[in-house]
């Protein structure tokens, strides 16, 4: 029991008019407007839970500055309430008491509660949190619920505070006068006050579980419930929602609608899930770097909703999401139950710490992207209570926020831990990218860590070195573009979003591993992504294009050489044609020379058809232009080193008949096809049964009704 000696003595020392004046003064937060409903207090279980939270996060002082002693034993509660609303109320009450810890301790000393009364040390935390709520209610009596079971420790502390109500109000008034402040809210540091102001307007962010419902279905469902789609929810008191500009599956709601939203089926069935936007930015950055069958390794995820979001985004792929750092295997059944409710199927839990996992672990050989969410100061978060509840952060997170800053020593410790994790992530040779994300506003935890890791990265690994890559998220404003000029993605704390820092490290491309289009298509065909489409060989036109590209790389001297070769070729062909025409126009040679010509004709084809003296000259004019064009196609240069010297031989030939003899004589006269091709007769003088030479038959089909047997080329002489 509390010893409250002197309570009655003090109760008669003050005038009732002074009491009413003190209680009517604005107290914490300056929220004394008529529109704000009067607070009636919290249930007993909330006070006990808040006292235990405060006991773990309170600011410890040196022995010379200790005003109140705190015990180390937590208070026992009748039942651990798992209701999220009770947890939120307890954390908010503990965090508020932590921000005003110095002021509340001063009021307790000034009001003579300490050390005039004998109070057990383990109740000091409960007195602090209940005193904050007492002054926030303007020292009004708490309204008790009939269904609530009272807790003895709470009842004792409440009776003590009510008995010292007047003196507590006077001590609070003197404290405000000392600091020249309208309320104790204005005694807080400016950074903390700005943080509270941002938290009051910060909207709610929720991502759509596309595994269960499409965005269009969510829009229609909300519209049926009276929600209107707008571009911005800022300063709007109606039931509205907006779509985030950076993440297509994230919706934004005004903060005052949370109690209404958590009771609808979309949130109860895990079709919409509340989460801070910074986590969605990190997850979408990873998704933009993944291929169809790439795995992901997530480090220090905090909230399992972040893992679930990553799993939902890769649901259509063959990717796996590995999560490391889950040391307690007892949580596995609960996690699997949660993942089943959300619809996640590709999550694998690793119980080792990230630092203890080897880079050559056989389970992580397909991991291409590592998402690193290191523990940071988190001072970019405006509403730390919501962040702790949603992201499962340590309660130590609240201590730094209550003071609006962090000590230099603690900042260095955090930066060193972040550097070690980042450098360890860069040792995974199979990984191609690392996404580094924090909620800190200090460069020591952001740019400095990334630049140091890039500068001192181990270049002895088999993989290519890492480099800083630009953001893969869309930049939606000029301010975002200016903040991302150095390839870092930043979002400063504001009334619409928490602060966020995002960096993407990717490996430099190996110049020896150039992948062609055909390789990509072949890889896709092997995976069955082309629906059975067969890849054909490259066409002749593509080959000619490749040859033309290689020829274009030659210099001007090569072009001049080609022109000289063309000129030499034309001169040689002109001389060859002139010599051939001279030999054909000569008179008939003796039989010996004729045999020599026949032998040479068997060796090679004539380059050009020479007119026979017996054939009239008008035959040249009657020939169509197309055969002449084809004749030029057969003109090929013959190098001199390949010329074969012909020796005269004796060949006994049958009697030679003139071209105007009978067809039988013509047919028996020609020993070879080449000699046969030399005789050309005018159409008017040659009978219809005269066989056409093979060259003209190939070039142009006869128009007369000559029998097919006569059009056959004659056989060689046996």
Curated annotation (Swiss-Prot):
EC numbers for this chain: 2.1.1.-
Cited InterPro entries: MeTrfase_RsmB-F_NOP2_cat, MeTrfase_RsmB-F_NOP2_dom, NSUN5_7_fdxn-like, NSUN7, SAM-dependent_MTases_sf
Biased composition (Basic residues): 538-549
The entry's keywords: Methyltransferase, RNA-binding, S-adenosyl-L-methionine, Transferase
Keyword Transmembrane helix: no
Class of the enzyme per the UniProt entry, highest EC level: transferase
GO molecular function, one term: methyltransferase activity
Active site: 439 (nucleophile)
Region (Disordered): 536-557, 578-616, 694-718
Sequence ranges of Polar residues compositional bias: 591-604
One family name in Pfam for this protein: NSUN5_fdxn-like
Entry superkingdom: Eukaryota
GO BP term, example: RNA processing
Basic and acidic residues bias spans: 696-706
Family: Belongs to the class I-like SAM-binding methyltransferase superfamily. RsmB/NOP family.
Protein purpose: May have S-adenosyl-L-methionine-dependent methyl-transferase activity.
Name recorded for this polypeptide: Putative methyltransferase NSUN7
Organism this protein belongs to: Homo sapiens
Gene: NSUN7
């Amino acid at each position: 029991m509390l010893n409250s000696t002197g309570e009655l003595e003090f109760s008669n020392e003050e005038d009732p008019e002074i009491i009413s004046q003190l209680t009517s003064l604005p107290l914490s937060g300056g929220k004394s407007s008529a529109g704000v409903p009067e607070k009636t207090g919290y249930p007993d279980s909330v006070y006990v839970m808040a006292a235990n939270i405060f006991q773990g996060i309170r600011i410890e002082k040196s022995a010379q500055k200790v005003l109140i002693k705190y015990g180390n034993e937590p208070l026992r509660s009748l039942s651990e309430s798992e209701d999220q609303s009770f947890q939120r109320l307890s954390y908010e009450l503990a965090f508020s008491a932590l921000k005003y810890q110095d002021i509340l301790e001063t009021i307790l000393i000034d009001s003579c509660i300490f050390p005039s009364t004998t109070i057990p040390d383990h109740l000091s935390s409960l007195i602090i949190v209940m005193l904050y709520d007492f002054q926030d209610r303007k020292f009004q009596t708490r309204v008790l619920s009939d269904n609530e079971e009272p807790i003895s420790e709470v009842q004792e502390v409440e009776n003590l505070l009510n008995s010292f109500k007047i003196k507590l109000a006077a001590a609070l008034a003197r404290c405000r006068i000392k600091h020249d402040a309208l309320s104790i809210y204005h005694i807080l540091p400016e950074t903390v006050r700005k943080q509270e102001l941002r938290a009051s307007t910060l909207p709610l962010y929720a991502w759509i579980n596309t595994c269960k419902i499409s965005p269009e279905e969510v829009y229609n469902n909300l519209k049926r419930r009276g929600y209107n789609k707008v571009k911005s929810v800022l300063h709007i008191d109606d039931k509205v929602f907006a779509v985030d500009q950076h993440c297509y599956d994230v919706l934004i709601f005004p903060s005052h609608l949370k109690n209404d939203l958590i009771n609808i089926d979309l949130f109860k069935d895990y079709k919409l899930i509340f989460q801070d936007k910074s986590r969605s930015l990190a997850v979408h950055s990873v998704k933009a770097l993944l291929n169809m069958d790439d795995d992901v390794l997530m480090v220090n995820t905090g909230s399992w909703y972040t893992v679930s979001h990553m799993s939902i985004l890769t649901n259509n792929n063959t990717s796996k999401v590995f999560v490391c750092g889950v040391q307690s295997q007892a949580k596995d059944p609960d996690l699997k139950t949660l993942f089943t409710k959300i619809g996640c199927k590709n999550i694998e839990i690793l119980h080792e710490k990230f630092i203890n996992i080897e880079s050559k672990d056989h389970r992580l050989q397909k991991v291409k992207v590592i998402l690193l969410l290191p523990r940071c100061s988190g001072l970019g978060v405006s509403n730390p209570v919501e962040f702790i509840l949603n992201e499962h952060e340590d309660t130590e997170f609240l201590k730094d926020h209550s003071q609006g800053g962090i000590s230099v020593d603690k900042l260095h410790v955090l930066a060193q831990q972040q550097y070690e994790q980042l450098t360890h992530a860069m040792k995974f040779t199979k990984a191609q990218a690392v996404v580094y994300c924090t909620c800190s506003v200090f460069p020591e935890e952001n740019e400095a860590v990334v630049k140091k890791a890039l500068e001192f990265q181990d270049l002895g690994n088999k993989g290519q070195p890492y480099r800083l890559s630009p953001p893969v998220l869309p930049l939606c404003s000029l301010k975002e573009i200016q903040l991302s000029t150095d390839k870092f993605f930043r979002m400063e704390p504001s009334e619409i979003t928490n602060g966020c820092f995002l960096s993407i490290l990717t490996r430099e491309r190996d110049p020896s591993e150039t992948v062609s289009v055909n390789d990509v298509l072949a890889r896709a065909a092997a995976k069955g992504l082309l629906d059975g489409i067969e890849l054909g060989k490259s066409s002749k036109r593509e080959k000619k294009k490749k040859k033309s590209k290689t020829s274009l790389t030659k210099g001007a001297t090569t072009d001049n050489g080609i022109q000289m070769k063309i000129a030499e070729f034309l001169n040689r062909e002109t001389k060859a044609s002139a010599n051939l025409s001279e030999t054909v126009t000569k008179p008939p040679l003796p039989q010996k020379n004729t045999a020599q010509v026949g032998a040479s004709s068997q060796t090679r084809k004539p380059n050009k058809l020479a007119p026979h003296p017996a054939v009239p000259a008008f035959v040249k004019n009657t020939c169509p232009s197309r055969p002449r064009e084809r004749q030029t196609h057969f003109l090929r240069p013959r190098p001199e080193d390949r010329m074969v010297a012909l020796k005269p031989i004796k060949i006994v030939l049958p009697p030679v008949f003139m071209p105007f003899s009978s067809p039988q004589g013509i047919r028996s006269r020609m020993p070879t096809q080449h000699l046969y091709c030399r005789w050309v007769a005018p159409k008017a003088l040659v009978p219809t049964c005269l066989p056409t030479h093979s060259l003209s038959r190939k070039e142009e089909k006869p128009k007369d009704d000559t029998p097919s047997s006569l059009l056959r080329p004659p056989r060689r002489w046996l």
